[in-house]
Amino acid sequence: MLGKVERSEMYILFAMTQVLLVDKISGITSHTAVAKIRHLTGIKKIGHCGTLDPAACGLLIMGCGTATRLIRYMSNLDKRYIATITLGTQTTTDDSEGEIIYSAPKPSLDKITLESIGRAAEKLSGTIKQIPSAYSAIKVSGNRAYNLARQGIIPKLNAREVRVHWKFLGDFENNQVHVQITCSSGTYVRALARDMGKFLGVGGHLSYLKRLSIGPFHLHEIYREINKKEATMSERTPSGNTQGLTDNMAISESDKHDCTEPGINCTELGIKDTCTALREVHYTQGDTLSFTRLTALQALSRIYKPIEVSQKQADDLSCGRYISLGIDSKGPVCAVCKENLIAVIQPVSAGLWRPETVLSDNRKLNSNAAQDASGST
């Protein structure tokens, strides 16, 4: 367990950085991953966007403290995955977690080729109508679809419009096809696997899923950060001994990057050619997670243009008042003052802007800065 001092230091670190890019491991829910961060930092207010199924792994974005208000801006971003679709078996959940309800005869499977799979993918490409998986979190008459499905009630789900782009990664072997999928928010990759199997007449389910990116946020950023820490560790301790590090962070040698994962290109992901990229960062006596940190400004400026505002304007925005800016934009921008993200603002009319989401109370920031200045004299 972390001591009070370590937990306090961790709380300050996370509260200041606010946004986490987390590599969720398979076997835990997204909620469990959030709970681990809560336990590690002592911060109660943590949220996430883009829920991953327990069997899935990869990028999960979390917001700490006031940064939970930013989640709405990240939830609707396009997502990119690598996936393995197993043809010939259909399951209740459309992934490997469910019970097998259909197995295709071998003669039917023998007719499947990469070309026929490509034709199926074409039918499932572009803007399409998709019926979500029965085992999903969609609400039907106030009930979660997966709760109804577990009771033996097949929920009637409406088709929704999604955008999908496929890229094949290798040959069709052992009834499996490896793909990279870029899709709009709300797309169920499990449903894509189900529909591909249905189109080919042999059934199919999703047997592997890893999320590589959410909009401009990428999984490889975590690996790059860990590589930097590995280099720092080597400089400090040539023998590789991590004891005595003073930054409350040590790197585990126990889990190397797995180059056998389908679709993983080490060069593309910025991982060293030797493939010794360390995947896990251990906080002293704490739980093990892989992540990197961003400030609220660093995160949101990847989505919206940052605009510097005056101290008076920042005060007004913090109080919910409109401000005047001599800029022309049809969409939201980030209002920034003294390198702090104050608010996300929307245009009301020519030159007039309103605060949509307020992140920082600029008056408190100025008060804290004044206290720091007086304390240093």
UniProtKB/Swiss-Prot annotation:
Q: Spell out where the chain crosses the membrane.
A: none
Substrates-to-products reaction catalysed = uridine(55) in tRNA = pseudouridine(55) in tRNA
Q: Which Pfam families match?
A: TruB_N (PF01509)
- Could you give a GO molecular-function term held by this entry? tRNA pseudouridine(55) synthase activity
Q: Which UniProt keywords apply?
A: Isomerase, tRNA processing
Q: Which CDD domains match?
A: PseudoU_synth_EcTruB (cd02573)
Outline what the protein does. Responsible for synthesis of pseudouridine from uracil-55 in the psi GC loop of transfer RNAs.
> What name does this protein carry?
tRNA pseudouridine synthase B
Species of the source? Tropheryma whipplei (strain Twist) (Whipple's bacillus)
What gene name does this entry carry?
A: truB
